[in-house]
Amino acid sequence: MGCRRVLSLWFPRLAAERALRLERGLTDRPLAIVRRAGNLQTLCSLSRAAEAKGVHRGRGLQDARAICPDLLTRAEDPRGQAAFLAAVRRWAGKFSPWVAEEGAAGLLLDLTGCAHLFGGEAALARQAEQECAAQGLTVQLGLADTAGAAWALARFA
């Protein structure tokens, strides 16, 4: 058997895209998911429309409203997001029997011995990306020999 291969799937807009799935009429509106920690409210997930208006993840809510006055917000729902990620994890099981959640918005798949079933690593990654897009999910992929390298490629390459 060849070397270990790990695919990292990172969903940078997972919480916002989950909210858009729940409220279908918001798809073209700028939407931010807001995390509250004490009196501090920060944006933890953004729709594509919000990012296009110049809003960035990690920014304070008041600053974001100054940049984008029509910004819609929804409170962060960690339990709902975890359940949604678990559903995505079950879907990803079609590519590998070993799928693990990585943080609140990522998955790691051990592709060792599995990729040939999909026509190779590139074809498997392409299929995963296309199926995510068809479901309205933005995904960034990283493929490497170690989980750490795959994680970094998905987020920074």
State where each predicted segment sits.
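Short, low-order "capping/linker" segments at domain edges
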Residues: 151-157
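Residues that scaffold, gate, or flank divalent-cation-dependent active/transport sites
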Residues: 1-108, 113-115, 122-130, 134, ...
